[in-house]
């Protein structure tokens, strides 16, 4: 009878898993050696066990380092060591650039000028003049913007003032329109002010002269009052 197929899945038993790993690792290394010798192949094999132990194999005509370097050239991949070296070079470049910028700032502030040559001083002067010109240009631009804002506010205030003047003229015309009919009856109404407004609120408006009071008397003698105030006219019905 033939052997049954083994299901490919993780072996849960630790002892059985270690025994199987040892057997299959040996078979894999044997196959790698045979492939390298029979086919003249440059071969590298790296194995890590579940416990982290390293096992490796490389062709007799080469080494693991040479195989990895060749792999990097062909695939373009990088190992951490090379990445760290590239990062160190980049940090060094940025540090030098930062120091150069700090030196330029100090020189623009008028410091550390003793080591500069005449050509370098002339170039520094041109840089300062260019920077000063840009500062003046920006300053003038801001001043023009502020002036335009003030002019805009002035126009707004003028429009508001014109609107208020129109409202005042309309109110004045309305008051004069009310006074004209009253003048026909001999009534004069001065323009309203604080005093006249207070007087208007204090009591009713009295028109012309006071008229004498009249009393109504019935025509029947028996309904007339017994006493009539003398010198007062009596209106007969």
From Swiss-Prot:
Subcellular location: Nucleus
SMART domains reported in the protein's UniProt record: MADS
GO molecular function, one term: RNA polymerase II transcription regulatory region sequence-specific DNA binding
Summary of the tissues where the protein is detected: Expression specific for female reproductive structures: strong at the adaxial base of the cupules, where ovules will later develop, then in the outermost cell layer of the nucellus, in the inner envelope, and in the inner half of the middle envelope at late stage of ovule development.
GO cellular component: nucleus
UniProt KW Manganese keyword: no
Protein's UniProt keywords contain Cell membrane: no
InterPro entries membership: MADS-box/MEF2_TF (IPR050142), MEF2-like_N (IPR033896), TF_Kbox (IPR002487), TF_MADSbox (IPR002100), TF_MADSbox_sf (IPR036879)
Principal localisation: nucleus
Disulfide bridge map: none
This protein's UniProt keywords: DNA-binding, Nucleus, Transcription, Transcription regulation
GO terms classed as biological process: positive regulation of transcription by RNA polymerase II
Pfam (any one): SRF-TF
Domain K-box: 84-174
PANTHER family reported in the protein's UniProt record: SERUM RESPONSE FACTOR HOMOLOG (PTHR48019)
Biological function: Probable transcription factor.
Protein name, entry field: MADS-box protein GGM13
Organism: Gnetum gnemon (Spanish joint-fir)
Taxonomic classification: Eukaryota, Viridiplantae, Streptophyta, Embryophyta, Tracheophyta
């Amino acid at each position: 009878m033939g052997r049954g197929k083994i299901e490919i899945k993780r072996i849960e038993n630790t002892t059985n898993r270690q025994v199987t790993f040892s057997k299959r690792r040996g078979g894999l290394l044997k196959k790698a050696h045979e492939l390298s010798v029979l086919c003249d192949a440059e071969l590298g094999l790296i194995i890590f066990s579940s416990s982290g132990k390293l096992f490796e194999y490389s062709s007799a005509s080469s080494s693991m380092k040479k195989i990895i370097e060749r792999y990097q050239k062909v695939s373009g991949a990088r190992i951490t060591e090379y990445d760290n070296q590239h990062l160190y070079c980049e940090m060094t470049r940025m540090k030098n650039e930062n120091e150069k910028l700090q030196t330029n700032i100090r020189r623009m502030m008028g410091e550390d000028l003793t080591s500069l040559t005449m050509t370098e001083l002339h170039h520094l002067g041109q840089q300062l003049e260019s920077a000063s010109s840009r500062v003046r240009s920006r300053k003038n631009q801001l001043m023009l913007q502020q002036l335009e804002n003030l002019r805009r506010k002035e126009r707004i205030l003028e429009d508001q003032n014109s609107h208020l003047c129109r409202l005042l003229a309309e109110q004045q015309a309305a008051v004069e329109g009310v006074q004209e009919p009253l003048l026909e009856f001999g009534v004069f109404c001065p323009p309203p002010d604080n005093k006249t407004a207070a007087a208007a609120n204090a009591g009713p408006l009295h028109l012309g002269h006071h008229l004498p009071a009249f009393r109504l008397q019935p025509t029947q003698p028996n309904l007339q009052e017994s006493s009539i105030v003398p010198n007062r006219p009596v209106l007969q019905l």
